Amino acid sequence: IEGVGKANLRMSVYFFELLKAAGITTHYISADIDKAAMEVLPVKPFGNGLEVICRYRAVGSFYRRYGAYIEEGAALDGYVETTLKDDALGDPLVTPDGLAALGIMTNAQYDQLKDMTQKVAAVVKDALTQKGLDLYDIKFEFGFYGDDVILIDEIASGNMRVYKDGQIVDPMDLTALVLGE
């Protein structure tokens, strides 16, 4: 889609700057929107890549898995789950014990990852709430910078499920709503 790359970069820069102001370390250093380029710290991903989802509502794959136990749209208090980045296997869920057994991260690193996920998601959620938007869930990627667990990749509209007045917001519309474009 025309312009998606720069739109995602603008959105990422917006949130990375909010995180920086909140004292949360990420891989982001700077960006040049015109050149569609972002300067980042050198990081090492977890294993072959790990996606970390923070959920505030029971929707999507969470609801499909657990619908017999929870009402669709029920509130979740920053529930965190992890999946291995593996398209061929459908990005399978992996537990903290599984991550340790596979040598991807220790239990202590998982605790740090979970804490960081909830802090980052809270900053994003608060920013969206101020714009009359409701964050239902968001997907992040983290990695190592030295021994520190930090946010890497992007914080783009396509990585989050957001609602306005009870209706899901299309990712391209979300960028415009958030950035006032």
What are these regions (language model features)?
Residues 105-136:
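A long amphipathic alpha-helix within ATP-dependent nucleotide-binding catalytic cores
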Residues 1-84:
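Active-site loop/lid in soluble adenylation, ligation, and acyl-transfer enzymes
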Residues 54, 135-154:
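Conserved metal-phosphate-binding beta-hairpin within the catalytic cores
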Residues 27-33, 129-143:
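A short glycine-rich, hydrophobically flanked beta-strand micro-motif that places a catalytic Asp/Glu
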Residues 155-181:
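C-terminal helix-cap and adjacent tail motif
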Residues 78-90, 121-132, 156-160:
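Phosphate-binding core of ATP-grasp and ATP-grasp-like enzymes
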Residues 1-7, 89-116:
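Short histidine-centered catalytic/ligand-binding loop motif
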